Swiss-Prot record:
This is Phosphoglycerate kinase. GO terms for cellular component: cytosol. It comes from Bacillus subtilis (strain 168). Its EC number is 2.7.2.3. It holds the Pfam family PGK. Transmembrane segments: none annotated. Substrate binds at residues 21-23, 36, 59-62, 118, 151. Belongs to the phosphoglycerate kinase family. InterPro entries: Phosphoglycerate_kinase, Phosphoglycerate_kinase_CS, Phosphoglycerate_kinase_N, Phosphoglycerate_kinase_sf. ATP binds at residues 201, 323, 350-353. It catalyses: (2R)-3-phosphoglycerate + ATP = (2R)-3-phospho-glyceroyl phosphate + ADP.
Amino acid sequence: MNKKTLKDIDVKGKVVFCRVDFNVPMKDGEVTDDTRIRAALPTIKHLADQGAKVLLASHLGRPKGEVVEELRLTPVAARLGELLGKEVKKADEAYGDAVKAQISEMKDGDVLVLENVRFYPGEEKNDPELAKAFAELADVYVNDAFGAAHRAHASTAGIAEHLPAVAGFLMEKELDVLGKAVSNPDRPFTAIIGGAKVKDKIGVIESLLDKVDNLIIGGGLAYTFVKALGYEVGKSLLEEDKIELAKSFMDRAKEKGVNFYMPEDVLVADDFSNDANVKIVPISEIPSDLEAIDIGTKTRETYADVIKNSKLVVWNGPMGVFEIDLFAQGTKAVAEALAEAKDTYSVIGGGDSAAAVEKFGLADKMSHISTGGGASLEFMEGKELPGVAALNDK
């Protein structure tokens, strides 16, 4: 990686503004899943141990530039304190004189969580004045929020113009793992692309067709490809305006010698619930009054075989509606194949795929689970991420 990291700077006695991704699920004022907080611990501990005064900035939810009481970061600061085993203070603002006064009382190694940066309308607009106000608090900027790296916001991009700016450990690991997958993958290299819509994955499919040996398609977006082969898809998800594009993707795969895998059979249902009547049919026989909601048993076996014979697998998007147990078997089969594959390095591209491996209790069997859904997709597409571009070069 050609960006400066924590290893390139001395932070002793300095105030460090560290952008983290604490956008965690909450219920009744409690953090229900602290995965993202735990992911930032190595960077936070390193900064504190090295004698920095650590300011932590994050967004939470979508307050749209105004104060929303239930989106304050107070419960997050409390949970972080439990994980660190020490007191973590919380500011009521993210910049300004009151925050500066709190910072002046900090000792080396202390941690202060700033208020939700999205309470300020300037954050998402990358307002230069707000970026400057953030920068005035600190001596050094560290970005450890890979999950927000594809956004050019005041706390992810603008602030870096005013301070020495380096990547935290989590950001560094994400860029190293995904960077190797994109530029120098172990082969056979397989990408699994699922999810609901073709339109959300156009860029990543286009980019991966130049890099992979095998491309596996699943989820709702698969039925546009099924239709492109000339089959009827019943009531399944279908993007009529993307059928020609699906055809061109299949043609390009053939030209490039990429093995293109799509469902051979599917699970069809008469309802979107655990009580639905279901059956498995070949893709050539999807009934007109039913909807395909998951991949079938034959397809699961084929996909599992491809996975187990791959050296590197990148997975982005589920095979079916895994939130409903009846329609979770395809996604589970992929997760289990990855968990069982001995010589396969598995990269889970955040978002729904990460939620799925968590749900099936297989997260610890994956080589790398990305903390950024949108960011990892854009990185795989070959786009420059503003939060990374803003950091100092080595």
